[in-house]
């Protein structure tokens, strides 16, 4: 049984996309409280704030994505972006590292923490 690795940028984009749908769902719940304007407005505003939060997250990951290192994945030969010391390919989820000390070691995201000493 192998562990499924995922690219950090894709994880953050998935979180932002889920915020959009959660926000729309929360705002839609407000429709069921049309008789009570306060509750309806509260649901609509919370849903709207979730959609705005997703916009902020998308903007942040877009800015972060422009600063990442682009490499060619050795498995699928497609360009991918790397955040941190270890990451996974965006296309084939192959574990990747640019740190020579980590080559050949088992993939672990703890290598990206500043408190980790190799």
UniProtKB/Swiss-Prot annotation:
The chain crosses the membrane at residues 12-32, 43-63. The keyword DNA-binding does not apply. It comes from the Bacteria. InterPro entries: UPF0295 (IPR020912). Keywords: Cell membrane, Membrane, Transmembrane, Transmembrane helix. It is a multi-pass membrane protein. It is found in: Cell membrane. It holds the Pfam family DUF2614. GO terms for cellular component: plasma membrane. The keyword Nucleotide-binding does not apply. NCBIfam families: PRK02935.1. HAMAP family: UPF0295. Belongs to the UPF0295 family. This is UPF0295 protein BC_0520. It comes from Bacillus cereus (strain ATCC 14579 / DSM 31 / CCUG 7414 / JCM 2152 / NBRC 15305 / NCIMB 9373 / NCTC 2599 / NRRL B-3711). The lineage of its organism: Bacteria, Bacillati, Bacillota, Bacilli, Bacillales.
